[in-house]
């Protein structure tokens, strides 16, 4: 029996001679290495189809090139090598290559006061592009934090002042009386509203970076906000968290400005687009602020 040659339909000519911006695969499961952690990820891999006469690309070649990602720590240099392999395997067909990786980074976070600690999840996406031999790499990071409304805090303080006047008027008080009152239900007759909030960061990195500064960026963002959500806590930690919220009252505008200044201080950041979302507990809608910035060339 004669062996038949397997057909390669993708190598045939297209009936419509049209180039395509992006062709590839989405949702490819793979492991990656970031800062010593082996993480489960999904990848979207593709190339441009610039030869409009070609029927299609060779998706299996892109798939096989992704094997590089589970063998080495993820760095800008590795991402560029993968993209170059995409193009080398599609010589004459494609000029541009694209790779998006989605994962959840787990960081062990200590409690504010007690010796407890717990794991915290940070959704991260890494997008790399090689367009006309120009390399670009971007990070998308989501960071959750708590925000307490400054206006609501002022209104709550006023109600507490009024309750104090109602309870004591012009009565002469001892220190112990005031201390007892402050520790009673009347001493906190009103509380400001607060909510879990989210910072969504899109950061363009310097492609010459040796690594991906994901941990450093997260640490800087949480330090700038001062109210990162916690993991394992005791009562002392919860009290410290209440203090942190009271010392970091924030409208969404305040949070956006804090993050703007923090990200500008990182030499690894070439540009960013940040969005903060405060899921208002007072309202049925969200309060949102955005900020963009691009570093001027030296």
Swiss-Prot record:
Q: Example GO biological process term?
A: tetrahydrofolate biosynthetic process
Q: Which domain of life does the protein's organism represent? A: Bacteria
Q: Which InterPro entries match?
A: GTP_cyclohydrolase_FolE2, GTP_cyclohydrolase_FolE2/MptA
One example of the protein's molecular function in GO is:
GTP cyclohydrolase I activity
Pathway assigned to this chain's UniProt record: Cofactor biosynthesis; 7,8-dihydroneopterin triphosphate biosynthesis; 7,8-dihydroneopterin triphosphate from GTP: step 1/1
Site feature (May be catalytically important) residues: 149
Sorted UniProt keywords: Hydrolase
Question: Which reactions does this protein catalyse?
Answer: GTP + H2O = 7,8-dihydroneopterin 3'-triphosphate + formate + H(+)
Enzyme class, top EC level, equals hydrolase
Q: So what EC number does this one have?
A: 3.5.4.16
**Region forming the signal peptide:** none
PANTHER family linked: GTP CYCLOHYDROLASE MPTA
Q: What does this protein do?
A: Converts GTP to 7,8-dihydroneopterin triphosphate.
Its family remark reads: Belongs to the GTP cyclohydrolase IV family.
- Put simply, this protein is called GTP cyclohydrolase FolE2
- Lineage, top ranks: Bacteria, Pseudomonadati, Pseudomonadota, Gammaproteobacteria, Pseudomonadales
């Amino acid at each position: 029996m004669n062996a038949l040659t397997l057909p390669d339909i993708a190598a045939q000519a297209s009936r419509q001679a049209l180039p395509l911006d992006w062709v590839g695969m989405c949702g490819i499961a793979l492991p990656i290495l970031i800062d010593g952690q082996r993480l489960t990820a999904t990848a979207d891999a593709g190339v441009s189809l610039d030869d409009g006469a070609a029927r299609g690309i060779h998706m299996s070649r892109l798939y096989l090139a992704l094997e590089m990602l589970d063998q080495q720590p993820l760095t800008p240099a590795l991402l560029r090598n993968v993209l170059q392999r995409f193009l080398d395997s599609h010589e004459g067909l494609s000029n541009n290559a694209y790779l998006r990786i989605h994962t959840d980074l787990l960081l062990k976070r200590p409690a504010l006061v007690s010796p407890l600690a717990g794991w915290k999840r940070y959704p991260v996406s890494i997008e790399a592009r090689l367009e006309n031999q120009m390399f670009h790499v971007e990070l998308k990071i989501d960071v959750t934090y708590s925000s307490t409304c400054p206006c609501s805090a002022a209104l709550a303080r006023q109600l507490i002042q009024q309750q104090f006047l109602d309870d004591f008027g012009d009565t002469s008080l001892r220190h112990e009386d005031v201390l007892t009152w402050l520790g009673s239900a009347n001493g906190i007759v009103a509380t400001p509203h607060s909510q879990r909030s989210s910072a969504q960061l899109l950061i363009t990195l310097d492609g010459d970076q040796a690594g991906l500064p994901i941990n450093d960026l997260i640490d800087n963002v949480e330090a700038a906000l001062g109210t990162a959500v916690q993991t394992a806590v005791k009562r002392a930690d919860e009290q410290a968290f209440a203090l942190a919220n009271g010392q970091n009252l924030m409208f969404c505008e305040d949070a956006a400005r804090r993050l703007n200044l923090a990200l500008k201080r990182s030499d690894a950041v070439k540009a960013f687009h940040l969005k903060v979302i405060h899921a208002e507990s007072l309202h049925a809608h969200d309060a949102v602020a955005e900020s963009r910035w691009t570093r001027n060339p030296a």
